[in-house]
Amino acid sequence: MSELREESMELTGPEKDRVIQLFPSGVVCLDLETTGLSPMIDSIIEIAAVKVTSEGESHFSELVNPGIMIPEYTIGIHGITDEMVAESRDVEEVMRDFLEFCGDLPMVAHNARFDLGYLVFDMHCHELKFPKSPVYCTCLMSRQVFKEMPNHKLATLAEQLGIPLVNHHRALADAEACKKIFAKGLLRD
């Protein structure tokens, strides 16, 4: 597993207490980076997640070899190149480990419909079973609890809420930011 973390953003104090109060077993905040916008023609190239439980936090972060060339325009967004994924495992192998990491904990993602579209499509293609856990979307949540925000993009919310977002558009950094946005939203709810 490769990790890209500049600094720890582990939940503490009231944020962690609220997450654990509402989700005693814990939650998994996740993010994907992809070669494009459609799961039917594009591929996952990075999967990351942060698991939050009463015992603490753990991380999953891995590049995925998509088996296709990564388009230049998406390299310009996330910075992930063909060379970076050349020795990485394929999506089926990574997905199996990712699902084991998540277990049956509730999942949280920013713009969850996008990430879930890829996860469900790839799981179906590889005959993997999607966990029967609820999924929460911080983008939808922010529209309810952070109505004053100029928009509900991950980077905007992070900036407005004082959440460091180093390496934006890398999956682990975005999963960490999603986790903090989720916790802050739960405190406001």
For the regions a language model picked out, list residue spans one by one.
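Short, glycine/acidic-enriched loop or turn micro-motifs at the edges of active sites
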Residues: 34-36, 140, 177
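Mixed-charge, glycine-rich, non-catalytic linkers/tails in nucleic-acid processing enzymes
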Residues: 185-189
